[in-house]
Amino acid sequence: MGGEGGAEPVIHFVFVHGASHGAWCWYKLTTLLDAAGFKSTSVDLTGAGISLIDSNIVFDSDQYNRPLFSLLSDLPPHHKVILVGHSIGGGSVTEALCKFTDKISMAIYLAASMVQPGSIPSPHLSNIHVGEEDIWEYTYGEGTDKPPTGVLMKPEFIRHYYYSQSPLEDVTLSSKLLRPAPMRAFQDLDKLPPNPEAEKVPRVYIKTAKDNLFDSVRQDLLVENWPPSQLYVLEDSDHSAFFSVPTTLFAYLLRAVSFLQR
């Protein structure tokens, strides 16, 4: 956000994808926002989407989040954005919140990891994105005698865990575009030091009630441990609200940001 010469500032949303996804997953939502006169930007993190970097050589969260950090650092003076993070992309949002506090007017977590900087995540959240079945396949970029460097959901589980309420066309699209996520990038996402200034930025949590990957109990625990200023529930959404309920999600985003203008 931010304007020149007294002009009304244009609200600017920046979207951060979750594991294996990319900027492409926000296409429905950004279309709605752009048509309504807002500005939207979707970021491909390192090794995701159309990034040319192999996720197996992404070593930490700083490298993974570099495209997001570059975008924020290049914003004009006094220009602020609303960050929206999905799934484990919530960790990227929180890290950006700590590093670029003065560039962010609101942080929105969509079925996302939301851990307070300086806190220790609850043991109940240790398997936050893992189902009971063996739903993941791993890549070993440094050899099978070393820890895995990448992870991707097995094709037969994609619809159930990611897109159970989403249109089949979006499931088909996603199955062609998902990429292995860099495991090492996620190891330090929730290990940020305390940051009192970041705590002052309004946060919003949007729950997904029919989520087979990130269940309501875990989402509720995140909200309880670090209460946001606003909480919304998408009753008919699977893990990927940008596909299953884009118009409702659009309405909730507008409702959330309306509080900034009061």
Swiss-Prot record:
Lineage: Eukaryota, Viridiplantae, Streptophyta, Embryophyta, Tracheophyta
Organism of origin: Arabidopsis thaliana
Active site: 87 (acyl-ester intermediate), 211 (charge relay system), 239 (charge relay system)
InterPro entries from the UniProt entry: AB_hydrolase_1, AB_hydrolase_fold, MES/HNL
Pathway it works in: Plant hormone biosynthesis; Lipid metabolism; oxylipin biosynthesis; Porphyrin-containing compound metabolism; chlorophyll degradation
Gene Ontology MF terms in the entry: hydrolase activity, acting on ester bonds; methyl indole-3-acetate esterase activity; methyl jasmonate esterase activity; pheophorbidase activity; primary fluorescent dioxobilin-type chlorophyll catabolite methylesterase activity; protein homodimerization activity
General function of this protein: Involved in the chlorophyll breakdown by its action in fluorescent chlorophyll catabolites (FCCs) demethylation. Demethylates the C13(2)-carboxymethyl group present at the isocyclic ring of chlorophyll. Uses primary fluorescent dioxobilin-type chlorophyll catabolite (pFDCC) as substrate to produce O13(4)-desmethyl pFDCC. Also able to catalyze pheophorbides in vitro. Methylesterase shown to have carboxylesterase activity, methyl indole-3-acetic acid (MeIAA) esterase activity and methyl jasmonate (MeJA) esterase activity in vitro.
Primary location class: cytoplasm
Name of the protein in question: pFDCC methylesterase MES16
Claim: Cytoplasm is one of the keywords in the record: yes
Residues spanning the membrane: none
